[in-house]
Structures are given as C-alpha cells and as structure tokens.
Amino acid sequence: MKANPFNELEKSEKIRKPESMRSYMTIEEVQALIDTPMPHEEYEIVKCAYLFSCFCGLRISDIIKLKWNDVFVDRGQYRLAVSMKKTKEPIYLPLSPEALKWMPERGGKSSEDNVFDLPSANTIRMQLKPWAKAAGISKRFSYHTSRHTFATMMLTLGADLYTVSKLLGHADVKMTQVYAKIINKKRTRL
C-alpha cells in the first residue's frame, strides 16, 4: 500500500474520538465532603489526603510517596518539591492555606517519613465510596476525582490554562484543555 487511504477522508468523514468524561466535585460537594466524617474514624487520613488533593491537584501515587523532606518554605510560602510519578517531571507546587489545612501534623516524624500514612490503595478505594454516599454525592467518585476537582476549581476561579497545566504537572497544555472545555460547558448552562 503506497498511501494511507484514511488520509483522503474529509475531516467530517473521520471517526471522532469521544470526549473524555471527567467527574469532578463542585465547590458545594467539596464542602459536603469536608462536613462529613469518614464512616470509619480510623480512615480519617484518607479524607485528609483526598481533600489535600482537591486543593493541590496531586495524584494519589504522588501523595502516597510524599515525604516530609518534600515540604519546604520559600519566602513564607509552603511548597512541595515533587517528581511526578507518572511523568517523572519535577514540579515545585505552592500550597494554598486550604491544602495546608488537610496536611497532618508532622510531630516527631523524620524528614524521610511519609506525610500521609495511608492504607493500601484497595482500602482507600473501599473507604471513598461510603464517605461520598454519606455526604450525599451519587456521581462517579474515585480518588482521581480530587485531581479533576482541583483543575476545574482553579479554572472556575480564574486561573489561566497554562498555570493550571503547570500545577498539574502536565507535559502538554492540550491535556489541560479538557478541563477548560468542562468549564466552558458549565458556563453556557448557566
């Protein structure tokens, strides 16, 4: 075959990939989660890690490996120095006062200790659904929803796409544009 026959098709004739559906929490739903205790008190750390991610955008894989020596203060601003597990890209993430509220106290932990002492990934998943249900949330809910929530909240509150892309550690702004489309659809419905 000398040439790809699909190159001859008009754009309107090509099969379009469906847009990815990203589930995220509204500000009201995040508040409901804040107000709702975990069904099992010993898993309150799962709630803290989830809400921390809602306010900083880290993936669960990055929160699990987050150490106290990754947290530092630069000119009065708390930051994280994180090498993203998925992209291997190092980022320096500023922490908002809201994100800091959900970080556990360091106490006597060493700089090599994990910030969040989390149970297994399976246990985390099992604890999230009953917590969301208790908060009155019936939509699709996973740990990654917290990352989507961060992105949509940042864009809703006026952050530019490039900044949100950098905060999420995306290699390409195109990956972040999915969230901008969500915000635009949300605005047109209002």
Model segments located where?
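Catalytic-site neighborhood detector that most strongly recognizes the C-terminal catalytic loop/helix
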Residues: 24, 84-88, 168-190
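Active-site/catalytic core of tyrosine-dependent DNA strand-transfer enzymes
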Residues: 94-138
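Basic, Lys/Arg- and aromatic-enriched nucleic-acid-binding interface segment
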Residues: 4-60, 64, 86, 110
